[in-house]
Amino acid sequence: MISGIKKPSVLFLVFLFIFLTVFAGCTEEKITTGEDFSFTALDGETKHLNDFYGKVIVLDCMAVNCQPCMFQMFELKKISENYSKNDVTILSIDVWVSSGETVSMLQDTIDAFKNQVNMTLDWTFGLDDLQGTIQNTYASAGVPTLYIFDKKGNIYYSHVGYEDYLIIASKLDMVLSQG
């Protein structure tokens, strides 16, 4: 009897996970000004979103304890490899700091990618503040959440949930073509 209950429950959970992964999200191509924020980089330095104006910015609101966020790293690595760092910068910000995620957990995740799958994550990583300022502003619907900002800091694109490289690349190509 118990095993009969588990099978439908597992199937339901698998279906629910697939549904949420595929259909979660909100895609908008409207231009609005991104609200500036600060974050703590892995080296302890405080950085601001506006420090990166002049380049197209891919903001990845993520968490180390989020499996879809880890899958998103593979797509962001393709972006890193295929776009000039003079044109596009990637910021992966762990927004679950208020849930206990730390610099060492984030660094361990970066190291695990290098050691376990031979992949260097060569972009800027940082942590939200304890109040969850970035999470509340940019990732209140969940993680991963991806934003693309134009060179002036306007939001060009946003998506909640895992996003494929080809979609990200097409959005980057469009915003880069606008100058």
Regions found by a protein language model. Name each.
Residues 1-30:
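Secretory targeting signatures
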Residues 26-50:
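N-terminal "domain-start" segment that seeds a small globular fold
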Residues 53, 61-78:
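Conserved redox-active cysteine motifs that mediate thiol-disulfide chemistry
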Residues 55-57, 62-65, 97, 142:
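Short pre-active-site segment immediately N-terminal to redox-active cysteine/selenocysteine motifs
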Residues 58-59, 90, 146:
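Hydrophobic beta-strand anchors of alpha/beta hydrolase catalytic cores
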Residues 87-103, 119-130:
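Thiol-based oxidoreductase modules, predominantly thioredoxin-like and allied folds used
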Residues 107-151:
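Short, internal strand/loop/helix patches
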Residues 142-179:
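Thiol-/selenol-based redox modules, centered on thioredoxin-like
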